UniProtKB/Swiss-Prot annotation:
Its EC number is 5.6.1.7. Belongs to the chaperonin (HSP60) family. It catalyses: ATP + H2O + a folded polypeptide = ADP + phosphate + an unfolded polypeptide. This is Chaperonin GroEL. It is an enzyme of class 5 (isomerase).
Amino acid sequence: MAKDIKFSEEARRSMLRGVDTLANAVKVTLGPKGRNVVLEKKFGSPLITNDGVTIAKEIELEDAFENMGAKLVAEVASKTNDVAGDGTTTATVLAQAMIREGLKNVTAGANPMGLRKGIEKAVTAAIEELKTISKPIEGKSSIAQVAAISAADEEVGQLIAEAMERVGNDGVITLEESKGFTTELDVVEGMQFDRGYASPYMITDSDKMEAVLDNPYILITDKKISNIQEILPVLEQVVQQGKPLLIIAEDVEGEALATLVVNKLRGTFNVVAVKAPGFGDRRKAMLEDIAILTGGEVITEELGRDLKSATVESLGRAGKVVVTKENTTVVEGVGSTEQIEARIGQIRAQLEETTSEFDREKLQERLAKLAGGVAVIKVGAATETELKERKLRIEDALNSTRAAVEEGIVAGGGTSLMNVYTKVASIVAEGDEATGINIVLRALEEPVRQIAINAGLEGSVVVERLKGEKVGVGFNAATGEWVNMLESGIVDPAKVTRSALQNAASVAAMFLTTEAVVADKPEPNAPAMPDMGGMGMGGMGGMM
């Protein structure tokens, strides 16, 4: 296929038009008085959002060169979202400022490689200073403040703070759509996995359609049980103890399932069978997690164990097990704390090594189930459009809060970027490197300027006053007052600010050092089909 090629100034100008188109659409959402953007959807109602990365992903431009520029900045938003989960609009604003300022200098004859060096030096210094001024997050109220700022909703802030308090920092907090109008929190204590009872005849509570086992023994195996003789020895031992039994196996079927159901209905013993969660290697790992949590063993041929040799000593124990049609929850497993801690450490090590987003999510879930529990925030709203928008905001707030727990908090509203201004300005450099540093200095002002503009104020006036203020004092765009940002609860996670700056600088440096751009040539439109008017089939009338 033929290609279009543009060089130097012409190439960069075309891409800059794309950068500006995307960034201008995204930056109207910045700050407490930022506006929304409406996105057309092929199916269903339009999506109304103020989430930078969601807007950036939707933008596709007709001109191939402009589109490349737009996609580069969308990459900044996307990468920041992957690393920190929030701050995508800030990252976009920073990238646009660095690219525009840099391009002016390249056009005036500056060497792009020198500019790149200066940009990298400035960003390294800014990040070091951010680490110095960040404060560790302490207590439920600090967590609530971070979440409330991100979601622009105090009620959401309180919900997220409560969820994190209940399940711990390692706990899993998921979002679901609620059937009602209100947003509420539902916490599942203990370990839950998505497998229900093998037969509805096993339930103990017909109103709730669930089976509740108090102080049960738990048989854990990766084998399929189809013959009752295989588990008869261990079954007899459990009956003698007078305790209920939970069987977690690859499957329980045929004669084995029929015998268990008949004896359950007769009242001989209380037993519930469920399928093992997960698939393949993940199934083995999850069964091992359950075994460690309950102090039992996984009965598997890989370890030379078969079901006939199982005894009550090899079974797990728990304070309570609740089995519904779709889920099984094990509460108060009696496993040893040392073993559980060791397992958690093992999963954390795997988390650090994995590069797959899917694996990371699954490992995080396993970690949460062992460490604390799972909290579900059920998001409610009056309309579907509002529900989608609210869900996106809560997701950002959740990510922000996790980032704050990880690396601490800094003054919000773009103030922290201005607080590192002096440190960056003090770097000694010459020539194009010094110009590169000035590009970053100009970009550091941009988020505050944009927040002020969105609040209907003159951005440059706010920026100039902020340069003279003490560290931590900033402009509250919601009220129009100058306040101590940390004391007023206007905070950003340091990780979000750091990621936004790093990713923006990375793409800006790549952009400025671009000398040629190659794109597919648009294909000429195919000629229209000829008129088919003369090809009537009247002569075929006799074939009826």
